Amino acid sequence: MTTWDKCLKKIKKNLSTFEYKTWIKPIHVEQNSNLFTVYCNNEYFKKHIKSKYGNLILSTIQECHGNDLIIEYSNKKFSGEKITEVITAGPQANFFSTTSVEIKDESEDTKVVQEPKISNKSNSKDFSSSQELFGFDEAMLITAKEDEEYSFGLPLKEKYVFDSFVVGDANKIARAAAMQVSINPGKLHNPLFIYGGSGLGKTHLMQAIGNHAREVNPNAKIIYTNSEQFIKDYVNSIRLQDQDEFQRVYRSADILLIDDIQFIAGKEGTAQEFFHTFNALYENGKQIILTSDKYPNEIEGLEERLVSRFGYGLTVSVDMPDLETRIAILLKKAHDLGQKLPNETAAFIAENVRTNVRELEGALNRVLTTSKFNHKDPTIEVAQACLRDVIKIQEKKVKIDNIQKVVADFYRIRVKDLTSNQRSRNIARPRQIAMSLARELTSHSLPEIGNAFGGRDHTTVMHAVKAITKLRQSNTSISDDYELLLDKISR
């Protein structure tokens, strides 16, 4: 076992697993008598190792080898030259440091030695200068495997196509816009910004755009990625000193699709690179599609210049599908799996799973798997049994009068206002919301709901549902109110 191997065991005990794997494990240390050369991957990595972990490395090597030693920090990838920083350690090494810079080429060796000086800076501070360049999370993503190969973006999944996307009032505008940009990229809706909660189909739509655009134009250069991968690509290009290639690849795309763009907020280096990438693509008429869990203005920490550019094109929402759409999703999913699902079972699952499409499909898979394993048909009874620990099946179903009370309390009006003939906006809008909630949360027919709201016609209920669905796509305040009420009533 080498001296450095012994040191690694001791260092590992003093660091988190993440720090050890990210910063210490990748470096290579070569020993030649009393000279220890710490090989780092580039200038940034060398500076970070030396400033953040220099004291720990020095004291650990002293413990395993003795005080009489020299530590040399080397940047192997410095173009045309090898830059080293040498620390000579003696009995006072913890308090004094002698630093020299050695620049080597074929003709001469030059060494300049500075006088020893007391350092007032602590190497144990939490944030190095790298964070000023990239932001903490970006810096911590950098690894130092010099021979590691990397590529840009992520593959598109063939299963995500428009034909498998179930359309309803909550997503039809987003779906129509997605189809348009896949046929005529860069012509309309640039950028296309799709926002909505997790598991509602944003990624499906985004990848469907890429897959369909590739069918329309097989020669189109399509890059799909998410913000996490974009950050990794960016910091890897810095680590490998290959930023030109990163920029060449991303800025030469005909269609750029980035999922969960909200995660670049607060990542200064990545946000700046994305800003320039956006500008380059937009000015060249290339299509940009972005998704987020929030409306652009609501993404905390997102630079104003990016918020402004996201507004250049079309912003559309994908909301939780209504009951009918949820049933349609379940029936289609079962059909795609080659399974028969009774309509009443689909309705039962749809009524009780209202969080997102992903959990809806997960519940379906559980019901189908359980029924198949037990050699039973997927009846409501089977669904009740196997989903008991997944969904809270209320002993009493949601009633319209409860919906009316919750909505009235929320908007500080009276229940009788909701059933009255008043048409003022402060009454009419809550009434429409209450009708829409009743349609989604109960099994009552349109005439029954209309009757509960002062004997109104079923067409009035239909109009209310359509109006609120449309408003939820364009008005974040209405959308937020609706989701909050949905949560209150469903508890």
From Swiss-Prot:
The keyword Transferase appears for this protein: no
Subunit structure: Oligomerizes as a right-handed, spiral filament on DNA at oriC.
Keyword field: ATP-binding, Cytoplasm, DNA replication, DNA-binding, Lipid-binding, Nucleotide-binding
Family: Belongs to the DnaA family.
Annotated PROSITE patterns: DNAA
Residues reported in the UniProt entry to bind ATP: 199, 201-203
UniProt-annotated stretches for the region Domain III, AAA+ region: 155-371
Any single biological process term in GO: regulation of DNA replication
Pfam families in alphabetical order: Bac_DnaA, Bac_DnaA_C, DnaA_N
GO cellular component: cytoplasm; plasma membrane
Single annotated GO MF: ATP binding
Domain IV, binds dsDNA as annotated region, ranges: 372-491
PANTHER family: CHROMOSOMAL REPLICATION INITIATOR PROTEIN DNAA
Keyword ATP-binding: yes
Biological source species: Francisella tularensis subsp. holarctica (strain OSU18)
Taxonomic lineage of the native organism: Bacteria, Pseudomonadati, Pseudomonadota, Gammaproteobacteria, Thiotrichales
Name of the gene encoding the protein in the UniProt record: dnaA
Localization of this protein: Cytoplasm
Protein name as annotated: Chromosomal replication initiator protein DnaA
Main localization, broad class: cytoplasm
